[in-house]
């Protein structure tokens, strides 16, 4: 197994970009102990970009042991909270200083538009790091009065303290590779935990570069480890490792169930941010053009590869035809192509496998009798994993598969409704409950619908708006626990009680 303290300067390069191809364990850049590798692809072309280690049980064991040792080390355990804060703030500065590089690397590996990579991956990641850095110095306990009887000459003092949970396993998806990594590691490190991060096998490159910058920011060796590999090997070993105290996972509900079950058996803390099938509800008073633009943004942002994508559109019957006609115009006008090209509005699906899965869902919509308004299965580009923006009209309110199955792509089904009770019932029929949006000028109606929706986040006249101070998570099959804000801090700390008799 090859080891080095710094990332190899002779890495493969594309257009001047260094492409990481080793993982970080204990402050050293290493290959897998098996020397096996995984290919990493450019989804805009289907070409191989580089390869990364195909980590397995032995590599996970090494990473967790490193994280556990650092957790107990004076370098980390005795580090003042203000020092952890400074490291995270420096890391935010480094992300911005290397913003162009990181954005291009993300677009090459993930396929998203370069502007999204700059704004959401780099810009938002820096914002989240700065917000979570502040929590390092603001963890508080409480002082309590006890009621149990004591001898007359004995008094007591009691207090609580928020302490790190321990080694955190952070397993992230491929749709926002850099941002999702920061969503996990920033609160974990701010609270004094150590982390083993496993990025998605499709999109590991910016996570590896993030780890390199974290070392440059002053993070002690072993505080952050990155293991690349497949979910069924590296991910499974990480979830089951006895020295991992908490698992933080974002991904599919299917995998989330497996992880949650494993954590339950081993009594690990776990937070799961899982699938979604978010409804977009347009009331009769909404301007049809605003409704169409809002619905298009809700489903086509990031190529539809968003857990809260507004994939179920419900429009009041009085403006239904007007709205879907305007939506069709928007869908047909979207330019599909490489995220690095000027004038492109939507990039590729992340992988060949996912591309085929999205096309299967489109075929299901056609087979189930929905009206294809725009898009479809025809390839818009000669190469790469591209899908046309696709809109189905479900005028007859059929119980089609697209209403229940998460597509995770640019595929929308639009259904009319006649009254509030009907649309609330339809919105809540999904097994998912991650997000929902309501489009109206009637605030009273919006608030009444909000009270009935089974969703972790409800937006009014916007969609997909998140903030580091705003808790984010789902109801029902969309997961357990919350990201962001004070709610996230609770998941990365536990309570120690102290009682003094004197």
From Swiss-Prot:
Keywords: NAD, Oxidoreductase. Pathway: Aromatic compound metabolism. The active site is at 273, 307. The keyword Secreted does not apply. The keyword NAD applies. Its EC number is 1.2.1.39. NAD(+) binds at residues 251-256. It comes from the Bacteria. Pfam families: Aldedh. GO terms for molecular function: phenylacetaldehyde dehydrogenase (NAD+) activity. It catalyses: 2-phenylacetaldehyde + NAD(+) + H2O = 2-phenylacetate + NADH + 2 H(+). SUPFAM superfamilies: ALDH-like (SSF53720). InterPro entries: Ald_DH/histidinol_DH (IPR016161), Ald_DH_C (IPR016163), Ald_DH_CS_CYS (IPR016160), Ald_DH_CS_GLU (IPR029510), Ald_DH_N (IPR016162), Aldehyde_DH_dom (IPR015590), StyD (IPR054805). GO terms for biological process: styrene catabolic process. Belongs to the aldehyde dehydrogenase family. Phenylacetaldehyde dehydrogenase that catalyzes the last step in the aerobic styrene degradation pathway by mediating oxidation of phenylacetaldehyde to phenylacetic acid. This is Phenylacetaldehyde dehydrogenase. It comes from Pseudomonas fluorescens.
């Amino acid at each position: 197994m090859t080891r080095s303290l710094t990332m190899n300067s002779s890495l493969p390069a594309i257009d001047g970009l260094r492409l990481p191809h080793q993982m970080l364990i204990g402050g050293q850049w290493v290959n897998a102990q098996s020397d096996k590798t995984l290919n990493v692809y450019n989804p805009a072309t289907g070409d191989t970009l580089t390869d990364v280690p195909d980590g397995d049980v032995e590599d996970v064991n090494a990473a967790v042991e490193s994280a556990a040792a650092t957790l107990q080390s004076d370098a980390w355990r005795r580090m003042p909270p203000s020092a952890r804060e400074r490291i995270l703030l420096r890391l935010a500065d480094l992300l911005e200083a290397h913003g162009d590089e990181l954005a291009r690397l993300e677009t090459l590996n993930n396929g998203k538009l370069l502007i999204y990579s700059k704004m959401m991956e780099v810009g938002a990641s820096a914002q989240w790091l700065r917000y979570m850095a502040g929590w390092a110095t603001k963890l508080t306990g409480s002082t309590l009065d006890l009621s149990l009887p004591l001898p007359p000459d004995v008094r007591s003092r009691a207090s609580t303290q928020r302490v790190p949970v321990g080694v955190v396993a952070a397993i992230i998806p491929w749709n926002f590779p850099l941002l999702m990594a920061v969503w996990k590691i920033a609160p974990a490190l701010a609270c004094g935990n150590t982390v083993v991060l496993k990025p998605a096998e499709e999109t590991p490159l910016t996570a590896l570069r993030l780890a390199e910058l974290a070392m440059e920011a002053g993070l002690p060796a072993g505080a952050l480890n990155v293991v690349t590999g497949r979910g069924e090997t590296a991910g499974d070993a990480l979830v089951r490792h006895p020295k991992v105290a908490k698992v933080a996972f974002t991904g599919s509900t299917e995998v989330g169930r497996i992880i949650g079950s494993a954590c339950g058996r081993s009594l690990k803390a776990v937070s799961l941010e899982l699938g979604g099938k978010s409804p977009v509800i347009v009331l009769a008073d909404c301007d049809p053009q605003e409704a169409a633009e809002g619905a298009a943004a809700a489903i086509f942002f990031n190529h539809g590869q968003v857990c809260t994508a507004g994939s179920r559109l419900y429009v009041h019957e009085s403006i239904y035809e007007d709205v879907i006609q305007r939506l069709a115009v928007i869908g047909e006008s979207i330019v599909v192509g490489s995220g690095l090209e000027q004038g492109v509005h939507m990039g590729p699906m992340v992988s060949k496998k996912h591309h085929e899965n999205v096309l299967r869902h489109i075929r299901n919509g056609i087979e189930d009798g929905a009206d294809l308004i725009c898009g479809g299965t025809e390839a818009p580009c000669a190469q790469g994993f591209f899908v046309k923006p696709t809109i189905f009209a479900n005028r007859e309110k059929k119980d089609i598969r697209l209403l229940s199955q998460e597509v995770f792509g640019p595929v929308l089904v639009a259904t009319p409704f006649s009254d509030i009770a009907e649309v609330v019932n339809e919105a809540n029929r999904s097994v998912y409950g991650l997000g929902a949006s309501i489009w109206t000028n009637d605030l009273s109606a919006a608030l009444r619908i909000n009270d009935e929706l089974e969703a972790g986040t409800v937006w009014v006249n916007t969609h997909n708006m998140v903030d580091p101070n705003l808790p984010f998570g789902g109801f029902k099959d969309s997961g357990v626990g919350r990201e962001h804000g004070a709610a996230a801090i609770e998941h990365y700390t536990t309570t120690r009680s102290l009682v003094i008799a004197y």
